[in-house]
Design a protein with these regions (language model features):
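Bacterial N-terminal signal peptides
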Residues: 20-36
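Surface-exposed loop and turn segments in beta-propeller and other repeat-based domains
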Residues: 87-99, 147-160, 203-224, 268-297
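Repeat-solenoid scaffold signature
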Residues: 219-258
Length: 383
């Protein structure tokens, strides 16, 4: 069941009496509680099992994929047979709290260059400080070679909170890489550090000449946007080529944003969320000069993983956004017309645990990772 909404209108779902949906200045606002029932007729098939806290996946040529496990393992898996092979020679990883081995991206020209990209929390000293890190490497057989550190966020800090992170390559070959604010919320408003930012780099790690802060020095040269909290979803729009990002709010205020060069996305100056246990954060949800979210969830759903659907298996979903939820253990479809939100659908809930990542294969198959000790990869099939 999909709830359609109109601009400046208010409509309440009959099945969800606590789900008002309204627009204000073109912004979609949600307050909801999800019961335990299915909204879409789909089946879930586990294709790979016995993965420990899988965090991200990307597709290799053929029927294989790479999957990260947060404790620090990278697996090559066969999506048809379920066979797993652990990749060797990984860098040192700080697997503490929310940190560990995080995102993986396979280069679009992998057949020619065997290149992949990994994001993870890396230790920086013996005292336990760590920072969000991006590397490239070549996958030769079942081991990594030619590893190059492309970026490390500054400063490195103790603790295990809010590392981010996702990485995607835009159509022009630029890398976009999200960095959490490590729980130092005020630092996200200071682009002189990397906390709470999205980084933009050439694939060799060099700073593009058109990065927004390269010449004016109002921020670090690597930064593309700032004012983010903990972005754990990133996707490339298949038509516009723009990068979409979602991030965790505090108690409420999870957001989806479309990135803009040099933009301030507000955290913690503006947010629809509040302190855990109650209490205001910042000056409110809006302020001049700060980008408003395309969509936000209040209360939070704890979004993680995101991809645009393109394919023939679910033809009615083409151009829509699929988002995982850790808190409500569900998959959400955001119905889009271009870049305008029309409504949402709960595809399923409470069937595989916490949904950590969502990926759509080149063939239009939808794969999901569950953030569980005995996790795995699941394929979504129509009934």
């Amino acid at each position: 069941m999909l709830l359609k909404v109109k601009k400046h209108g208010l409509k309440t779902c009959r099945l969800l009496p606590k789900l008002p949906i309204l627009f204000s200045s073109g912004v979609l606002i949600f307050v909801f509680i999800f019961p335990n029932f299915l909204w879409a007729k789909v089946d879930l098939v586990q294709v790979v099992e016995k993965l420990q806290y899988p965090w991200a996946m990307d597709f290799l040529p053929g029927s294989e994929a790479l999957v990260t496990e947060k404790p620090g393992r990278l697996q090559k898996v066969n999506l048809e047979t379920g066979k797993k092979t652990e990749i060797q020679n990984l860098p040192e990883i700080h697997a503490v709290g929310q940190g560990g081995l995080l995102d993986v991206m396979v280069h679009p020209d992998f057949k020619q260059n065997q290149k992949i990209f990994l994001t993870f929390s890396a230790p920086t000293n013996a005292s336990g400080d760590a920072t969000t890190t991006l590397i490239s490497a070549r996958l030769e057989g079942h081991q990594l070679s030619d590893q190059k550190t492309l970026f490390q966020a500054d400063p490195a800090l103790p603790g295990g909170h809010h590392f981010g992170s996702r990485v995607r390559m835009a159509k022009d070959g630029m890398l976009y890489f999200s960095v959490g604010e490590r729980g130092r919320m005020k630092e996200a408003q200071d682009p002189q550090n990397h906390l709470g930012t999205v980084i933009r780099l050439q694939e060799n790690g060099k700073v593009p000449q058109d990065n927004p802060f390269l010449k004016n020095r109002k921020g670090r040269a690597e930064i593309f946007s700032y004012g983010h909290r903990n972005p754990q979803g990133m996707a490339l729009h298949p038509k516009t080529g723009k990068i979409w990002v979602h991030e965790h709010g505090p108690q409420g205020g999870d957001e989806i944003n479309i990135l803009k060069a040099g933009a301030n996305f507000g955290w913690p100056k503006t947010t629809f969320g509040e302190q855990y246990g109650g209490g205001k954060i910042g000056i409110g949800p809006k302020s001049p000069g700060i980008e408003e979210p395309l969509l936000h969830w209040t209360p939070s759903i704890a979004p993680s993983g995101m991809d645009f659907y393109q394919g023939d298996i679910f033809p009615n979903w083409n151009g829509d956004l699929l988002v995982g939820s850790l808190k409500f253990r569900m998959l959400v479809r955001v119905d889009l017309e271009g870049s305008l939100v029309q409504g949402q659908e709960v595809v399923f809930q409470d069937r595989i645990g916490r949904v950590r990542d969502v990926r759509v294969s080149p063939e239009g198959k939808v794969y999901l990772l569950n953030d569980e000790y005995r996790g795995g990869i699941f394929r979504l099939d129509p009934l």
